[in-house]
Amino acid sequence: GLVFHDGEYHLYYQYNPEGSDHGNMSWGHASSPDLVTWREHPVALPYADDAEIYSGSIVWDGDGDAGFGPALVAFYTAHSSVRRHQAQAIAYSHDEGLTWTQYEGNPVLDRDSGDFRDPKVLRYRGPAGDYWVMSAVEAVQQRVVFYRSDNLRDWELLSEFAAPQVGDGIWECPDLFPLVVDGAQKWVLIISLGMAPVVGGFGTIYFVGSFDGTTFVAEGDFRLLDHGRDNYAGVSFSGLPDEDRTLIAW
């Protein structure tokens, strides 16, 4: 999860606090005033017995929509390797993201799926209204699913996006955001592709199009975000001014 808040960039990353192998997935935390000099903090979200903390995002809920008062709200995939199950859960922080409280009603979104992950949340403000939008993936089915919420806890399915021309592979880490192109607002949808021939293994693609608050419509074929190998799992910071978009990937 990446968020810019009160003049600081906060980077939350998947981390095994007990070793260098994949496992015990938790969220580590580092912060920076300039994206160059970083300060490490204690583990932000530790894994539980049957719930590892997979990728997600963070937003500043200044109006207290979620019922936690003004707070940073983190969205993450709760992963159970025992049950092979993935659902979306939330936690909140009142101390600039240093410590977090798990929401007692977790998970907030469950599709009874083993491959439903990587929630990225943004605030949509447009002709359709003013509400929160979540992008997530059904990774093996190669679909981005879009949900809306007024309170960050109860989510309603809006639409799904697929692109058969991408070919084989799994989809991960979607990121939907507006961007001004030649003076006009467009919407960009970024998707990481794993084990995908079209990117030579692992890489990132993006679509440019429109989003009416419900449905994303691509205006053409996908493009490569980076022509090097293994640019993967990148997401952009929330909390930056609308005209700014900064992304960090593996």
Language-model features, listed with the residues they occupy:
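Beta-rich carbohydrate-recognition and catalytic domains
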Residues: 1-119, 123-173, 180-228, 241-250
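Glycine-rich, charged/polar anion/phosphate-binding loops
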Residues: 232-233
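Anionic-ligand-binding alpha/beta catalytic cores of soluble enzymes and soluble regulatory domains
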Residues: 236
